[in-house]
């Protein structure tokens, strides 16, 4: 395996928006090069999680090595590195792009360029990759390849005179793509003699062998007898095995510059072998690591609580296991008077949050309550100190703070221009600041807004899709913090604060949200033997209030006529009992109430 010259290697990835046919194209390439035999083939071969196949998205990166005999009768090694297309995983995308020399830009010939495609194309251009435009799904009746080519030229500025028309479904154009990969994508630089450096572009946790690391050798070579050093985590390991993905793992003795492979070295957790870290040799380490490494910081936080308190240890264990394979997931224990014991978790974004929640419920059989997602706020205290807070219920009282700052994102929304008005309305409702509007083609438009992240992480995406019949797509990145007139909205049930329902809202919206919350809770909390006040408050000021009337037992049913003082005595006794009950009684808020309110909160 090691006598391949570097000039015969091509490393490439596929860039595409969700649903533009990336995984199907990858399947077809694996099939046509004979990498995967027909009988082993299943749809979305590289998407290894069931959840990925169901949602039709790629979450974890995969890689596959293909042998291809080109028309010049030379045999080439093609390494396909799969990338996730979703904005939450953009750091993983940027690392896998760094492991390539070229990219196939796949655009759906019936839909055109979408937001995610653009975000990843710009990442690819920053990494100086050779980009080959591919128009997929040309067999569909609505496909208009020429119009889409024009769109690619206008929006991205790529020359599409040699773009390839293909249909991953029927197999049309697949041969042209393979030839283009060989002829147009440059081979890796020949740095076999340099000090060893390899880039980690993915890793996953295997319960038997520890963490399996996928890497691309940038310079030098790695032998299976070597001792390696990871430059960011400063840990060293003896190698157990190295190999290639074809696409099943296959052991080899050595990998050289330009090659892509995997290694196992009894690494305990994915956090020790982070995506973007540099592998070098322990005995002759490289001076500088490869550029661009950063730790992924969570942007969205929420509380996870088991519906059954006995499941708390299981939840902790499953989060520990998940973290072994998902280094971006952060969590710490949290308790709440209303929900009991649980965890405060941090995620890269909303999709990441949903996926973690779904994996916990599916793979570990847990039943969870998820509190409303929140973001990191910066609180300026009176003593000029700034603190970062990810849980609204821990924000200090108004007396001890000067102001609250919230994160803003710059958002680009791509959509057919007939939905312009509804989208602008949506952005304005969400406190967005209009920046620019560009016509991409005569009938497609880009809206650029600066908008608070907190308004995006709830249901912005769903709203955008439903108002545009699913045609709009969006892309956003963080641009910093801004001061706003924000307040902490508490909900008091029987004068006790319900932490999971605490939220940070803009002062102008506080009354409406508070009103909605107390009305919803009134419907959902069952009556008790005593009257329950439900209040929404900002600091010590109550802004909305409702009360649930008490259940009454008819204590006068035994009195037939007779003296009024007897009846008064019984009613007085009942009132006294209710008063004592109200002082001692605890209101159990049913879980459905929390769930319904969280939806409303969003």
Curated annotation (Swiss-Prot):
Primary gene name: lepA
NCBIfam families assigned to the protein according to its UniProt record, in alphabetical order: lepA (TIGR01393), small_GTP (TIGR00231)
Domain tr-type G: 7-189
Predominant location: membrane
Top-level taxon: Bacteria
Protein's recorded name: Elongation factor 4
PANTHER family associated with the record: TRANSLATION FACTOR GUF1 HOMOLOG, CHLOROPLASTIC, TRANSLATION FACTOR GUF1-RELATED
Bilayer topology annotation: Peripheral membrane protein
One GO CC term on file: plasma membrane
